[in-house]
Design a protein with these regions (language model features):
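P-loop/Walker A NTP-binding region and its immediately flanking N-terminal helices
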Residues: 6, 11-179
Length: 179
């Protein structure tokens, strides 16, 4: 129910705990130090890959690390591989207002048409950020034709492109994608 007067509705002030407390930089991620140290070092040295595959059980930080990596590679003032959180790029990523970072939930968008559309869009250079990043969550849910369509862009990606795939079921990801 809404309060009387100029007070906000309680529902307008509610924020899910996972959103409020989700790590924003690698150093805030708990229990994945070996992974976050590697990612931070790659960003700091400018030696990031064009594709990553994050795997693990639910709640281990795959999507969170993917979002931090996407922010870090686009940060205008990174500090030892960590995103600064203050530059225009970091603020846009945190607010979810940039078109250059796309998250796709493969559990609900698992068809070849969605991946073909992604592939057609991916060839364009980023509108604002340094890199265009696609985070595909639950990638194991893609159909076989969708995996085949994804493979084409993974094999020869443009320089400005990065894919971060996340899965809880690595055994369902085709070997051609894993290589």
């Amino acid at each position: 129910a809404c309060l009387v007067g100029s007070e906000m509705c309680i529902r307008d002030r509610y924020q899910a705990l996972y959103r409020k407390w989700r790590p924003k930089v690698f150093s805030e991620v708990v229990g994945q130090e070996h992974i976050t140290d590697t990612l931070r070092r790659q960003v700091a040295e400018g030696h990031t890959a064009h594709a990553y595959l994050f795997t693990g059980t639910r709640g281990t930080g795959k999507t969170t690390c993917a979002r931090i990596l996407a922010k870090a590679v686009n940060c205008l003032s990174p500090v030892d591989g960590e995103p600064c959180g203050r530059c225009e790029a970091c603020r846009a990523v945190d607010a979810g207002t940039t078109l250059d970072i796309t998250e796709l939930d493969a559990a609900s968008n698992n068809g070849v048409d969605q991946v073909r559309a992604l592939r057609e869009e991916a060839v364009y250079t980023p509108a604002v950020l340094k890199k265009r990043v696609y985070i595909i969550d639950e990638v194991h849910m893609l159909s076989t034709p969708a995996f085949n369509a994804l493979l084409k862009i993974l094999e020869e990606p443009p320089e400005h492109l990065m894919f971060i795939l996340a899965t809880t079921e690595l055994h369902k990801v085709p070997a051609t994608i894993l290589s």
